[in-house]
Amino acid sequence: MPYRSTEILSPGPADKAPLHRVTLTHDQRHLRRKLLHLENDDVVMLDLKEAVMLADGDLLALEGGGYIEVKAAEEALYEIRPRDRLHLIELAWHLGNRHLAAAIDEGRILIVRDPVIRAMLEGLGATVNEAVEPFHPLRGAYHGTGHHHHGHGHDPHHG
């Protein structure tokens, strides 16, 4: 019989020891209702009221007690290295303008591999290398608002 969870603890408190673990890619961590396969071959039915973006270390609270830990899976990524800080800002702008998920650090940006985007970045002078590691992109400005649309000139006060 599968476990069932209707609640997320984010971030997972250090004093809550998980019973099991589920490892998911970035795309797989965006969910509302799904049967998840745990590392020990058990399953948990996640049944939330609304869609969430799970993060590495979150805990799924199980009905009847106990927790399942969410781990970020290693993914095939591009590691983008800029010439300097100003170049990092420019590259981040181009990625954001294309609505791409990106993990931005002081000296690098990580994105999911896409050869077209790689060519664009290299054309902008970036060094792009393949990497395999967990992907923790920044949450966007519209994260948690319950929708994914945004205004592009729809406000009559902004031309």
Swiss-Prot record:
SUPFAM superfamilies: Urease metallochaperone UreE, C-terminal domain, Urease metallochaperone UreE, N-terminal domain
Gene name linked to the record: ureE
Pfam families: UreE_C, UreE_N
The protein's name in its UniProt record: Urease accessory protein UreE
Compartment(s) where it occurs, according to its Swiss-Prot or TrEMBL record: Cytoplasm
Highest taxon in the source lineage: Bacteria
GO CC terms, sorted: cytoplasm
Molecular function terms, GO-annotated: nickel cation binding; unfolded protein binding
Free-text function comment from the UniProt entry: Involved in urease metallocenter assembly. Binds nickel. Probably functions as a nickel donor during metallocenter assembly.
NCBIfam families cross-referenced by the UniProt entry: PRK13261.2-6
Gene Ontology BP annotations: protein folding; protein-containing complex assembly; urea metabolic process
Region (Disordered): 140-159
